[in-house]
């Protein structure tokens, strides 16, 4: 059986989740609003609940790790939000990596969402096989 990974994209209005195999094939996906109550609920609380609900019907022990793309300036070495994107109150300083590792007992990698988009294109998308690429992303 191939290794399975959980991909989590934390955006300005929604968290998107995908169960992905080691070849990059999406097996299952879901989405949940992060702005449903005007950001009164801390974003990471919403993300954690969404992950819990998403992996419940799947074989969680088979997960090899969690990859998170997040809006804002991300300190990828520590997995912490270093700067805001503007619309998330209380986002700076949030320890995404540590929180999710403690909650789910899996290794977690966190990076900026625009960087992740381009890495995905290089790995399995339109930029596959190219050594020099540029990506432009527009978001909420």
Regions found by a protein language model. Give the residues of each.
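Short glycine-rich, Thr/Ser-proximal phosphate-binding strand/loop in the N-terminal lobe
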Residues: 2-45, 49, 81-83
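Short glycine-aspartate micro-motif
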Residues: 5-9, 63-67, 133-137
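A generic "binding-loop/recognition-motif" signal
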Residues: 13, 114-115, 140
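Short loop/turn microsegments at loop-to-beta-strand junctions
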Residues: 15, 69-70
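Bacterial carbohydrate/catabolite-sensing allosteric modules
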Residues: 21, 32, 58, 125-133
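Glycine-rich phosphate-binding loop and adjoining helix at the ATP-binding site
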Residues: 40, 44-48, 62, 66, ...
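Alpha-helical scaffold within the catalytic cores of cyclic-nucleotide enzymes
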Residues: 47-57
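Short glycine-rich anion-binding loops that position phosphate/pyrophosphate groups of nucleotides
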Residues: 71-74, 139-140
């Amino acid at each position: 059986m191939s290794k399975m990974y959980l991909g989590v994209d934390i955006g300005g209005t929604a968290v998107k989740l995908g169960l992905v195999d080691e070849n990059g094939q999406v097996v299952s996906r879901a989405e949940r609003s992060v702005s449903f109550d005007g950001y009164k609920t801390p974003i990471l609380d919403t993300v954690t609940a969404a992950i819990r609900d998403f992996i419940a019907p799947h074989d969680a022990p088979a997960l090899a790790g969690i990859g998170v793309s997040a809006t804002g300036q991300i300190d990828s070495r520590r997995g912490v939000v270093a700067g805001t994107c503007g619309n998330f109150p209380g986002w700076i300083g949030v320890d995404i990596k540590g929180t999710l590792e403690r909650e789910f007992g899996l290794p977690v990698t966190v990076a900026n969402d625009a960087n992740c988009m381009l890495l995905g294109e290089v790995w399995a998308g339109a930029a596959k096989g190219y050594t020099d690429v540029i990506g432009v992303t527009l978001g909420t």
